[in-house]
Amino acid sequence: MKRKEFIKIIGLGGLAISVVPNGFSATLGTKTNEEICRSQWNTLCGNIGEVYKTDAFKYVHPKKGKPNVLIYGDSISILYTSEARAQLDDKATVFRLFKNGGSSQNFIPNMNTLQETMFQPNLKEGWDFKWDIIHFNVGLHDLKYLKGKNLNKEGKQVSSISEYKMNLQAICEYLKSNFPKAKLIFATTTPVPAHAKGRFEGDSVIYNKAALEVLEKYPDIKINDLYRFTKPHLETWAQEPGNVHYKELGFLAQGKEVAKIIETEL
């Protein structure tokens, strides 16, 4: 799969798009109180940093004159966030979603929660800035199969291909409608190894193909092909055989790659 850049043109027929209320848009020049924002952020995140044993969820405060970057994704992104943030430390302020982003159907509700919770006017003296770059991925939680709440290949798939494409198109429209000045970067879904629990090897290829079909309509959304970047190192980077997650060698390399791609848009 070759990394490409696509640029997107809005045009969605009858698809219903969730639009952030005007009240979510911060008024420029209003005071932001770091203590209030930090407290709100810590409440929003809860103990997720302890669960994942990472500082990816530590509070970061916007800095005057620095671009504001948001990383949205699942546990793969949770692991590489800290390295991406470190690589861009002198160039941008890198935020991430307050939780594991989950499947494509969770994207818009999660983004709305972030805006409603952390930004003015909903939070008095809260964040007061616009996103300059949003780097996002959905897919690994769409292609999985669940029986109840447990990963099980005999269970039901979270999102069919058609559902995934519909959700991703809605996501693109949502981002363009609510964050029109933000540069958007979509990261392809990383590989599913053989014998993965609740996931079938090769499904990432199928879902990435579907994603690229959607993104062809949005050529200004850049593609960060993390699948292609990761695939040659799957065996050496995997935490263990059959695990979709990566050990430090892998997620540090992914973090550097994500930072490199983001930097091209700064």
Q: What are these model-derived regions, one by one?
A:
Residues M1, P21-C45, G49-E50:
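C-terminal segment of N-terminal export signals and the immediately downstream linker at the start
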Residues E5-A26:
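N-terminal export signals
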Residues W41-M166:
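Conserved SGNH/GDSL esterase-like catalytic core that processes O-acyl groups on lipids
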Residues D142-G148, A194-H195, K231-T236:
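Short acidic/His/Gly/Ser-rich catalytic and metal-binding motifs that mark active-site loops
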Residues L168-C172, N208:
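Generic structural signal for well-ordered alpha-helices
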Residues F179-K183:
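A short helix->loop->beta-strand "cap" motif at the edges of active sites that frequently abuts
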Residues T189-L226:
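Substrate-gating cap/lid alpha-helix
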Residues Q239-L266:
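Histidine-centered active-site loop/cap adjacent to the catalytic His
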